[in-house]
Amino acid sequence: MNAVPHLGVLALQGAFREHRQRLEALGVRVTEVRRPGDLAGLQGLILPGGESTTIARLMTDFGLWQPVRDFHAAGGALWGTCAGAILLAREVLGGPPQFGGHQASLALMDLSVRRNAFGRQVDSFRVPLAVRGLAAPFPAVFIRAPVIERVGEGVDVLARHQGQIVLARQGRLLASAFHPELTPDPRLHALFLEMSLTVSA
């Protein structure tokens, strides 16, 4: 009998409960990650949408930066959605002025991401998004979304909106500018589950 897949969701701030619900609907055991010890035994970790500067500060407070890097180095998959994509990126553009334009990140994925590229919260929108590998469009919800302005050679672009990159994969890393957890469509969570099981096998 196969073991139940075990994934984590960073649960410091943002839409972590919605991610948990999507994963549990796929039969996944889910741990809410708040401290380094919570990473033990996980096959993948989702960095949710929220406020990237707040999540970054809390990651510092809870000592999570290096443990998450180590988790990935040991074979764990990572998926950043919206603010989480910012935290994965090697380069963050448009950082908060109060921090001199600097935005802390894990710097694991060869991307340049611009914060809040799609505007303010009142500019939120939902579009049917053509995603490479999916037979039908995905209902993508954008809320003050970032945009991926540059990708490195090892990064696969999976989706664009109005010509701008909004979903990309680099090995065991997945970054989405939108919020897949805010729709009942399970296909991207299923993709991340497959990534997590493949890399940890």
Swiss-Prot record:
Protein name according to UniProt: Pyridoxal 5'-phosphate synthase subunit PdxT
BP GO annotations: glutamine catabolic process; pyridoxal phosphate biosynthetic process; pyridoxine metabolic process
Annotated PROSITE patterns: PDXT_SNO_1 (PS01236), PDXT_SNO_2 (PS51130)
NCBIfam families recorded: PLP_synth_Pdx2
Domain of life: Bacteria
Subunit structure: In the presence of PdxS, forms a dodecamer of heterodimers. Only shows activity in the heterodimer.
SUPFAM superfamilies (UniProt xref): Class I glutamine amidotransferase-like
GO cellular component terms, A-Z: cytosol; glutaminase complex
GO molecular function terms listed in the Swiss-Prot or TrEMBL record: glutaminase activity; pyridoxal 5'-phosphate synthase (glutamine hydrolysing) activity
The protein's role, per its UniProt record: Catalyzes the hydrolysis of glutamine to glutamate and ammonia as part of the biosynthesis of pyridoxal 5'-phosphate. The resulting ammonia molecule is channeled to the active site of PdxS.
Record key words, sorted: Glutamine amidotransferase, Hydrolase, Lyase, Pyridoxal phosphate
Organism: Deinococcus geothermalis (strain DSM 11300 / CIP 105573 / AG-3a)
EC number: 4.3.3.6, 3.5.1.2
Family recorded in the similarity comment: Belongs to the glutaminase PdxT/SNO family.
Keyword match Cytoplasm: no
Pathway: Cofactor biosynthesis; pyridoxal 5'-phosphate biosynthesis
Residues engaged in binding L-glutamine: 50-52, 115, 143-144
InterPro entries: Class_I_gatase-like (IPR029062), PdxT/SNO (IPR002161), PdxT/SNO_CS (IPR021196)
CDD domains: GATase1_PB
Record field: catalytic activity: aldehydo-D-ribose 5-phosphate + D-glyceraldehyde 3-phosphate + L-glutamine = pyridoxal 5'-phosphate + L-glutamate + phosphate + 3 H2O + H(+); L-glutamine + H2O = L-glutamate + NH4(+)
Active site: 82, 179, 181
